[in-house]
């Protein structure tokens, strides 16, 4: 159970990526001895999405948010804060025991239709996507390049309603 004098804050930062951005943010958290419970970052075409879930003492949370707002402004990024309840955090932690699967989608090129079909099957089976990662290099715009390969990895969690049916549906794509 979370002590009464601590707060859980989900920090979401978006905007143009640049070297030192994550260091600047975590330096502020370190200044107030915050504990980072989870962190994730994605960069798509130089656009950053950074999430940090931290625990801090209640008397520090306002100072942390104020300093992060000023730092975000000086870096030209957007920062948002979301309070997380103890119950929400505990429910999230308890999800780690669920089954985890890696699904890899491979082709010469991958269309929105193909990705939509895969993710629809996963959703219908009650699976949750934790992460999506491109495993191949950046795809050139020249579609005549026959050596191009595209590969995306989905990290999914949960127990499928019907694993065999899910596998059959995925193999038919």
Which stretches of residues belong to each language-model region?
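A conserved regulatory-domain signal marking ACT and ACT-like small-molecule sensing domains
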Residues: 1-173
